[in-house]
A protein has these predicted regions:
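Amphipathic alpha-helical substructures
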Residues: 2-97
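Active-site lining segments that contact anionic ligands and/or coordinate catalytic metals
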Residues: 23, 80, 124, 173-175, ...
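Extended alpha-helical interface modules used as scaffolds for assembling large macromolecular complexes
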Residues: 91-98, 103-113
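Generic recognition of flexible, low-complexity loop/linker segments
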Residues: 9-13, 64-66, 138, 165-166, ...
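PDZ/PDZ-like domain segments forming the peptide/carboxylate-binding groove
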Residues: 108-151, 155-159
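PDZ-domain C-terminal substructure recognizer with occasional recognition of PDZ-binding tails
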Residues: 144, 150, 156, 161-186
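Solvent-exposed, polar/charged alpha-helical surfaces in well-ordered, non-transmembrane soluble domains
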Residues: 24, 44, 60, 64, ...
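Residues at alpha-helix termini
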Residues: 69-70, 99, 141, 170
Length: 186
């Protein structure tokens, strides 16, 4: 399903992106839980055991290097089970806070339908350009890629009345009626 454009945004995640996120989570977890230990220590351990002798390695070898670097095989096993073999995401908000980065709502107090780049005015019509992300207000309303938004809260959406203008008159949590055309029908 990852190559199917009809729901790609909800089904595809690059393992490069995921791996970078898991590594960031691991580095920050090490920095907060193990005095003086960082991901660099794990990478040096991997180099010592696999780089100099040029030996191939697998996930279990990296887990073992983490266990040696931290001296805590239970931690290594639980981290790998949750985030490498599993599908959980590290607790980025609390981990990044330790690094001085605060995660929060992009526009608190402002109404939102989903990524504003999902909707574009094309030829006088407001078109949903990409599949709405699962859980977003557009997704919950039933909008899909290629749908044409006709009205929001009874206001016709056209060149004179934009989606942004209607949303600015509302607050987060407001329920806004959406009239739209999907696959030729309303």
């Amino acid at each position: 399903t990852a190559v199917d454009p009809s729901n790609r945004g909800n089904t595809f995640l690059s393992y490069y992106t995921w791996g970078s996120g898991v590594a960031l989570g691991l580095d920050l977890t090490l920095r907060t839980s193990f005095d003086g230990i960082t991901l660099d220590h794990v990478m040096r351990e991997m180099w010592r055991t696999h780089g100099i002798p040029e030996r191939s390695y697998n996930v279990d070898d990296i887990e073992a290097a983490l266990a040696r670097a931290t001296g805590d095989p239970t931690f290594a096993r639980s981290y790998f089970d949750a985030y490498v073999r599993g599908t959980q995401a590290p607790r980025y908000a609390s981990l990044l806070a330790v690094a001085g980065i605060e995660l929060g709502a992009a526009r608190p107090g402002r109404a939102w339908m989903g990524n504003p780049n999902h909707v574009q005015m094309r030829g006088g019509a407001t078109i949903v350009m990409t599949t709405p992300v699962t859980g977003s207000p557009m997704y919950e309303a039933g909008l899909d890629r290629g749908d044409r938004i006709l009205a929001l809260n009874g206001e016709t959406i056209d060149a004179d009345t934009s989606v942004r203008a209607v949303l600015q008159a509302h607050s987060p949590g407001d329920v806004i009626a959406v009239r739209y055309e999907s696959r030729g029908g309303e």
